[in-house]
């Protein structure tokens, strides 16, 4: 992977080696069938919601908030890790693109970094209560399965501000926060910006 930086017409090139990782397999059994394979009656809803999420992640603003060190949005136990293969009731599904942080229902969720809210929805099919924040130049964070969404689209949020509460909405098996980080449509390991 090569990065090129140009400052005052001086070009600097940095090369980083991308290492191969081994990902966990996470098996979850005993789920209601609707949590594993959604009924056809909700396919249009899911497609519309996925398009809206994609649009919120595609924003390329001039904000510079991505430069600050991000903080953990909620205290709890990490119960799901980035990249783990999900097998639901024996059926392989997409890898997990975030970290799950198990916490008590109603626990306050802080903004991991300063930014502007680009999505604030109470009830998406898969992710339930969902907030997406733009931190600049394609970097966004997603907070999912919220019981309460306490911000609105367009709000400018400071790092550490309360944006919602932990819940178990959408396709969820218990109270937790699914926290994700993206660079446009590329999913990043949230631990890479938290450490």
Residue ranges, per PLM feature:
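Catalytic cores of peptidoglycan-degrading enzymes
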Residues: 71-195
């Amino acid at each position: 992977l090569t990065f090129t930086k140009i400052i005052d017409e001086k070009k600097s090139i940095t090369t980083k080696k991308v290492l191969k990782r081994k990902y966990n397999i996470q098996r979850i059994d005993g789920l209601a069938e609707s949590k594993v394979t959604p009924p056809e009656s909700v396919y249009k809803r899911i497609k519309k919601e996925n398009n809206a999420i994609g649009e919120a992640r595609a924003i390329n603003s001039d904000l510079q908030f991505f430069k600050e060190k991000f903080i953990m949005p909620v205290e709890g136990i990490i119960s799901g890790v980035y990249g783990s293969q999900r097998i639901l009731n024996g059926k392989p599904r997409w890898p997990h693109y975030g970290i799950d942080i198990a916490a008590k229902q109603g626990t306050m969720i802080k903004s991991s970094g300063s930014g502007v809210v680009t999505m604030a929805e109470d009830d998406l099919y898969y992710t339930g209560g969902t907030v997406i924040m733009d931190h600049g130049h394609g970097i966004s964070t997603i907070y999912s399965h919220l019981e309460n969404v306490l911000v609105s689209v367009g709000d400018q949020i400071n790092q550490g501000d309360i944006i919602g509460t932990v819940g178990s909405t959408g396709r969820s098996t218990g109270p937790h926060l699914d926290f994700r980080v993206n660079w446009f449509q590329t999913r990043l390991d949230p631990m890479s910006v938290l450490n």
